[in-house]
């Protein structure tokens, strides 16, 4: 949506594996700037014609396709494949082989904006990780809180679960209801949040994270609490 009418960008290639051949506006009606255009199949040769590419693929697929993309193409990966520094954490939370890590592209954090501008490959942060890291960063950076026990409860809208039809996301199930899920330290954004805050704090961070599915289409409300380091 941002790129569709952006004066600094010309969109020359839009691929969608499962929707290849379909009109873009039949899937995303708000993208009127692409009226009459269709989704293409994913092709590394077409990607290589681009100056900048955004990848929005399921876990593990960006790591596979990046091997076929030329080094001259700048890439922003919207998936999780290159977010984590720790191979152990990746294997634990994603149960897949580790592909390495790229610059973590959260521009509001210290020093990140200039680093992103100079990078050829960047990893876009996750949704929960963005909201929680930005909420906690000022207190963590200032040393005002005890980073060994940060507690987060965050509610997300239904679009965070993707477009695939699911019973638990139907109107009758979701309306007037709040549902916690992937709690107890198993949500895949947990290590991402901890790594991001550890970079700021310069010390170990531990996060207790409870995500909640809320009856709203989009958005995240994150409540972040911790004990202070300020003497009474």
Regions found by a protein language model. Name each.
Residues 160-232:
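Charged docking surfaces used in two-component/phosphorelay signaling
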């Amino acid at each position: 949506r941002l790129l569709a009418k952006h004066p600094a960008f010309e969109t020359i290639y839009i691929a969608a594996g499962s929707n290849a051949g379909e009109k873009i506006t039949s899937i995303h009606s708000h993208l009127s700037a692409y009226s009459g255009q269709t989704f293409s199949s994913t092709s590394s040769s077409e990607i290589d014609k681009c100056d900048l590419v955004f990848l929005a693929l399921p876990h593990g697929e960006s790591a596979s396709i990046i091997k076929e993309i030329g080094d001259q193409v700048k890439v922003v990966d919207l998936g999780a494949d290159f977010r984590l520094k720790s191979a152990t954490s990746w294997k634990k939370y994603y149960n897949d082989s580790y592909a390495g890590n790229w610059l973590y592209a959260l521009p509001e954090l210290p020093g990140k904006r200039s680093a992103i501008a100079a990078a050829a490959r960047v990893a876009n942060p996750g949704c929960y990780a963005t909201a929680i890291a930005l909420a906690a960063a000022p207190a963590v950076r200032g040393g005002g809180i005890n980073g060994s026990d940060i507690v987060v409860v965050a509610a997300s809208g239904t679009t965070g679960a993707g477009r695939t039809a699911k019973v638990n996301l139907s109107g009758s199930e979701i309306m007037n209801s709040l549902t916690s899920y992937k709690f107890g330290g198993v949500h895949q954004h947990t290590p991402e949040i901890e790594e991001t805050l550890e970079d700021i704090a310069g010390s170990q961070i531990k996060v207790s994270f409870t995500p909640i599915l809320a009856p709203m289409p989009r958005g995240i409300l994150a409540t972040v609490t911790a004990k202070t380091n300020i003497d009474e």
